[in-house]
């Protein structure tokens, strides 16, 4: 059984696995470290044309994905993965970060044991899922986003977006990948999954690599940006590798890397330093 399973609802099923079928994610897919299935929303469309959208109440440009169509597609997905939490890539959502990704995977791991214990409770598991999935308060903390899910469902919106009632009825968590607009939710879904997959045990050859990457608050750069990287040749277009990296003095090298990380972070992402100071004060 894979460690992470994603069910993807989309009107463009041919977009998956896409880039996730290559490189590290592709190898992990072949090893069954993660798995996925795709549900074509148009299979639940209306009329012979399989329509999935309609005009917006209240006017405005663009078409809205219908709640009846999406509801049927979601119900089908939940029948296959009843413990899944539903995610909707949206510019209104909480911004997806490295820390957010780690929280999601940690919650999956911590709650996998409780899933098995649920099987021994007298209350039918299906009843439990409906109550927790659809009636959980909308203001739940990020740390509880995946409290009930080993499986994930991604709802990929198109056109102007989806009917708000779908989000309310299924208690869908909206996730943003940044302050910009894309044509649909497929690319954000690929981005989110790629980040999650590479954090799974067995995907990276050396799991310690994660500690030396940008945004890792417990890592080498303490949540800042990674320093510049260098490899052979030693001189390229009259540009030399910094001499400290050739010295063999690991103490000096580590100090240089941290100084460079601090300088780059202060210049390009100063808010990350504020987050670090806030963490130290708490």
Curated annotation (Swiss-Prot):
One Pfam family cited in the UniProt record for this chain: tRNA_m1G_MT
Keyword Cytoplasm appears in the UniProt entry: yes
Keywords per UniProt: Cytoplasm, Methyltransferase, S-adenosyl-L-methionine, Transferase, tRNA processing
Name of the top EC class for this enzyme: transferase
Gene Ontology cellular component annotations, sorted alphabetically: cytosol
E.C. numbers: 2.1.1.228
GO BP terms in the entry: tRNA N1-guanine methylation
SUPFAM superfamilies assigned to the protein according to its UniProt record, in alphabetical order: alpha/beta knot
Catalytic activity: guanosine(37) in tRNA + S-adenosyl-L-methionine = N(1)-methylguanosine(37) in tRNA + S-adenosyl-L-homocysteine + H(+)
Binding residue positions for S-adenosyl-L-methionine: 157, 177-182
Lineage top rank: taxon: Bacteria
Location(s), subcellular: Cytoplasm
One Gene Ontology MF term: tRNA (guanine(37)-N1)-methyltransferase activity
Subunit (UniProt): Homodimer.
Annotated NCBIfam families: RPE3
Function text: Specifically methylates guanosine-37 in various tRNAs.
Protein family according to the UniProt entry: Belongs to the RNA methyltransferase TrmD family.
Name of the molecule in the record: tRNA (guanine-N(1)-)-methyltransferase
Naturally occurring in which organism (per UniProt): Rickettsia bellii (strain RML369-C)
């Amino acid at each position: 059984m894979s460690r992470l399973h994603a069910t993807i609802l989309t009107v463009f099923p041919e977009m998956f696995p896409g880039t996730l079928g290559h490189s590290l994610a592709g190898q992990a897919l072949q090893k069954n470290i993660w798995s996925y299935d795709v549900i074509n929303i148009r299979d639940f469309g209306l009329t012979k044309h399989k329509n999935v959208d309609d005009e917006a109440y209240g006017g405005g440009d663009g078409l809205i994905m219908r709640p009846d169509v999406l509801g049927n597609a979601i119900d089908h997905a939940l029948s296959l993965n009843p413990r899944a939490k539903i995610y909707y890539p949206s510019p209104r959502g909480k911004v997806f970060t490295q820390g957010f990704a780690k929280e999601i995977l940690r919650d999956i791991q911590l709650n996998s044991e409780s899933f098995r214990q649920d099987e021994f409770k007298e209350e039918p598991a299906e009843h439990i899922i409906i109550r927790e999935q659809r009636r959980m308060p909308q203001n739940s903390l990020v740390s509880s986003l995946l409290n009930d899910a080993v499986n994930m469902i991604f709802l990929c919106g198109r056109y102007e977006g989806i009917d708000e009632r779908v989000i309310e009825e299924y208690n869908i968590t909206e996730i943003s990948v940044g302050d910009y607009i894309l044509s649909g939710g497929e690319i954000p879904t690929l981005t989110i999954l790629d980040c999650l997959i590479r954090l799974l045990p067995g995907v990276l050859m050396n799991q310690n690599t994660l500690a030396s990457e940008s945004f890792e608050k417990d890592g080498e750069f303490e949540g800042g940006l990674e320093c510049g990287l260098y490899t052979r040749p030693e001189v390229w277009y009259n540009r030399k590798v910094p001499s400290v990296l050739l010295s063999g003095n690991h103490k000096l090298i580590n100090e240089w890397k941290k100084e460079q990380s601090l300088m780059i972070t202060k210049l390009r992402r100063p808010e990350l330093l504020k987050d670090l100071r806030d963490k130290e004060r708490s």
